[in-house]
Amino acid sequence: MNNNIFSEITPDIIRLAAKSEAADIIDTELFTKYDVKRGLRDLNGKGVLAGLTHISDVRATEMIDGVSHPAHGRLFYRGYDVKDLVNGFTKDNRFGFEEVAYLLLFDELPNKKELEDFRALLSKYRSLPTGFVRDIIMKAPSQDMMNTLARSVLTLYSYDDRADDVSLPNVLRQCLQLISLFPMLSIYGYQAYCHYHDGKSLFIHRPDPDLSMSENILHILRPDSQYTPLEAKLLDIALVLHMEHGGGNNSSFTTHVVTSSLTDTYSVIAAAIGSLKGPRHGGANIKVVKMFEEMKQEVHDWTDAQEVSTYLKKLLHKEAFDHAGLIYGVGHAIYSKSDPRAVIFKSFVEKLSVEKHLEKEFALYSLVENLAPKIIAEERQMYKGVSINVDFYSGFVYQMLGLPMELYTPIFAIARIVGWSAHRMEELANNGKIIRPAYRPISEDLSYVEMEKRR
């Protein structure tokens, strides 16, 4: 029973909510009648064309004899295949976050000098205003880390003398500062909550200017600041793979929409955070981890394909886990035959599972990866291919890295703010109109009713 009066849902509120719902329901046939693209997607799930972008390209089909066919997914950042980018920096034993961020923001791969200068600039910006941790982050810590992150971002507005300046140089400066600060805002917020609500010891580590983004995340998160090279490498790859995914995903489109009003950078990024927080967007890997935790309890032999298949069918029949009828981490709005991010991720995930002595868990994930698409196709009579998506393995990776579940979505935000920044810059550079789609009214015109005549 919640005794917080602020959060109380009274009988009056329940009554009024029912009244509101009854007034707001729209007959689903009307959406078809007026050819409304619900979710801005057509009947096949393809997004309507709402804009153009240089930043990235998500491909899942190929043309054969003039006909579009499903193909293995590919993801391009500024024209470069992400697979080639990851192979490039891992082969040379470099961290990729800063290099790929430079590419997304400036449309070219940096040379050695440009990369060194860019890393130095991000390091320079990796410092919060004096007293910010004490006065903002430590005060009234929230149980939700995405809300904490959004609040911190909005509060930074008051520390910026040029907060409302939307000139490109100023917006770039703001975006680079936020990219640099996101790990601190996220992790310090989590540590403050654990200290005040769970009584845990408080460790506040300053970022190390000589470390990469992924190394700094592990450095400031862990009490002893220790991590292995493989841990840092895999987190770096995870950040790169989550950095950008087209202008039509919900948070990037939110960035375009809010930017088009010419509001400030802090408001735009806070809006994008709010979008990413939603369970339909940024929280899928948490569902995957929780689903597997139950699976490991319910399935006695993790190597038995028949027993695992039986559990997966229970998921689809709404007889297991959250009874939603979903196998989390399988399927994607665009990709069908394969998600390139998951394909890239898998080989590195296996290496970390060996280092962490979690080979049996990895084998279970691999078995589900092989079984789930076939079972979904059979049970749902789907003719479009289905495969695992990047969320399938990312939660397992974060679990192996010892990242608290409360930080899974903020880690996503730490990566995706690079894409948001690139889309904000692109929207401003093209000086487009304010985004304002149409909504068709379907209510009847009514005559005003005097008070004494109302029912």
Predicted regions and their residues:
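Non-transmembrane, aqueous-exposed alpha-helical and coiled segments at domain scale
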Residues: 1-455
